[in-house]
Amino acid sequence: MRVTSDEAVVFIVDDDADFRDSLVALLDSVGLQTKTFGSIKELLATNFSDVVSCLVLDVRLPGLSGLDFQAELAKTNNLIPIIFLTGYGDVPMSVKAMKLGAVDFLTKPPRDQDLLDAITVALQRDRTRREAARELAALRSLLQNLTPREREVMGLVAKGLMNKQIAGKLGVSEATVKFHRGRVMEKLGVRSVADLVKMTQRAE
């Protein structure tokens, strides 16, 4: 199946081929793109982090289990949303999965609507996360355009210091502080000190 950057993809990992096929048929019926794998090892052989996506993952898999894989992803800060499927309905296991950020924990075979609802939530979560990451990268790129002195002034403004206080702290005139603050706001495209403070907080 062809996967492009603007398509959301549901990655299905389950060692039961018939069950995988049934999920593909369900998701295809509502226009969702899918890629299927019989094990974590097969999944790792592909690039599954470049598009808006989620994982539908069997808890008990040959080799690395679903929960172990979730823990490994967390260690590498890979935040792809996961929906766990289990034939056992293990409550302690589901609690552990949810604490690590799983979207849902469903008993196999799941109700079609329950699975579709969970996938909708998961894909929106991933889409929102990616948009936030792009915005943060763009903001940090803008901050690179500031001079060291401008970054210093910006940091002090964000801490709530007045121009006079900043001038005293830096050993410069108040007019110089106003100039640097104006340049910072111009470069970052903000119109008020409140917006500047918010932008500083987002970049941290």
Q: Language model features by range: what are they?
A:
Residues 45, 67-79, 96:
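Short amphipathic alpha-helix used as the core "switch/output" element in two-component signaling
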Residues 137-175:
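Helix-turn-helix DNA-binding segment
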Residues 90-92, 106, 110-120:
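C-terminal output helix
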Residues 58, 86:
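Active-site residues of response regulator receiver
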Residues 36-54:
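Acidic, metal-coordinating helix/loop segments flanking the phosphotransfer/catalytic sites
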Residues 1-11, 17, 24, 138, ...:
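Non-catalytic signal-transmission and effector/linker regions of two-component phosphorelay proteins
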Residues 185-204:
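Basic, Lys/Arg-enriched C-terminal extension of HTH/homeodomain DNA-binding domains
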